[in-house]
């Protein structure tokens, strides 16, 4: 994902590009149904990547507050993620020159989440 990062872009753009890249691979493997864009729009990636793409590095390893996420009420963060179909945690910030951040895309095949989605007929 580092190749697409440009100064002043929103981190959500990078996060969404990671979702799309991973979804395209999963569709190609037959693990997600339909076009990748439809799967992402439907929230399928929250089942397999229920976290942000990465985080900034600073005085604290997970310097979330400096990146626009002022609330550490994880319940409300999870609720917003479910409503938007994306993980919004640690994504509400603009990338500025000199920003240091991690790039941690990853898929987690969590049986409880997969079973829940299957039971609901999703993805």
Give residue ranges: language-model regions.
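Active-site neighborhoods and metal-handling regions in enzymes and metal-associated proteins
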Residues: 1-123
